[in-house]
């Protein structure tokens, strides 16, 4: 191999090494200038857009702490005149869920679920003006959506 060819090969190897170093530097700087965490608004929107109804479940247990978190999220929903016309029934008894699945035609998925939370509207709750709450269905719907979004954020499958 002549000296001119050796020089070209060494120059090419050095150029490739320099290019690789520059690419690494640019990538490192780009990563350093990007925020470590996504803005809260982006995280919330991503959670809203990724939420979907899940009707087929794994056998992964759902802890009492997770169920409590879901109920807390539901209870944080807004309500008309702050009536909070809801009751939450947490069901984690497999036998009870299988019985409900057998009786409720649109809840067959309960037979496979590890737990369930029933959101019940309490129509006897009175508004501040002493009249029965007219918004109980809307209020319970908002609570249910909070619960579903929290389940999505926790990596749990859920359905309305």
Which ranges hold each PLM region?
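Short amphipathic alpha-helical segments
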Residues: 102, 130-131
